[in-house]
Amino acid sequence: MRTTTSLSEFIAESTSHKAEYAHHPVQLLNEIARAGNKLSKQINIAGLTDILGDLGNVNVQGEIVKKLDLFANDTFIQSLSSNSHCAAIVSEENEEIIVLNDTPDKEGKFLFCMDPLDGSSNIDVNISVGTIFSVYRRTDSTKKVTKEEFFVQGNEQVMAGYIIYSSSTMLVFTTGNGVNGFTLDPSTETFYLSHPDIKTPTDGEIFSINEGNDNLVPEGVRQYTQFCHETSNGKRTHTARFMGSLVADFHRNMLKGGIYIYPTTTAAPNGRLRLLYECAPLAWIIEQAGGKASDGFGRILDIRTQDLHQRVPLFIGSSQMVEKAEQYMLDH
């Protein structure tokens, strides 16, 4: 018999008063969970339906759009549009903001940022993928939304999370009071609390980086990966694990202890990952779990977004590992 808490029960317990709920970002969670459930179903039968492969067009990132990218994007937009408190969305798949509810009668208090399907290039080979999202509170919900409202620092987030679609589907999020993980029961289409108050180890053995870029990355990164390859008494001190799926690599490292690095390269001098809807939300999650997130020299959450699709380098994971990597960057 089930004894754990459902997502709906968790939301109710988090906002015991109606007035508190009206201003709390968790009121978007039901729509997020609904979209995640729908996308999870589609991913699970992707090989049996005509939804694998490319659409043939290119998104604002210069990336080939997958059929599932578009499905995921549309699914989350449609779900969130039903919540009058979501004023506008920034998505990896759209060049400009998507305005939903920004009139005074709609009370659109929140701004939603998302990568609707991170790692979608892995879908065709059945590797874990995910959705990353972030929520900010508007300073004035009586005005029309402009893209400048999204030019914020990550430390202004009021909710951040991700959904990982793998052997099971999990929703992991924070509102600033720790990190909690919920696993989807597909038989009831309900998320249940399975990983309460997640804490990441202060140190770890896993390092996740695309070492195929070794000749393209800064010297500090090369020196750090060489350090990770060192042995002690004939045994390795670290182990390399890189799936090429940000959510999957991050999720494993947060639970087991490790570091994920996507640095600048000569081909991507500003980094590859997007600040607003990839790096900032994961940075807040890892900090809430006791870890650290950096661009190699400073805190990710202190960076102010200057462009909707701004890219930054990312060093994220167990605090001691991130600090060690930062030291190598400073020394080289």
Placement of each model-derived feature along the sequence:
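IMPase-like, lithium-sensitive Mg2+-dependent phosphomonoesterase catalytic core
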Residues: 1-50, 57-59, 70-332
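Alpha-helical scaffold segments that form or flank carboxylate-/histidine-based iron centers
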Residues: 63-66
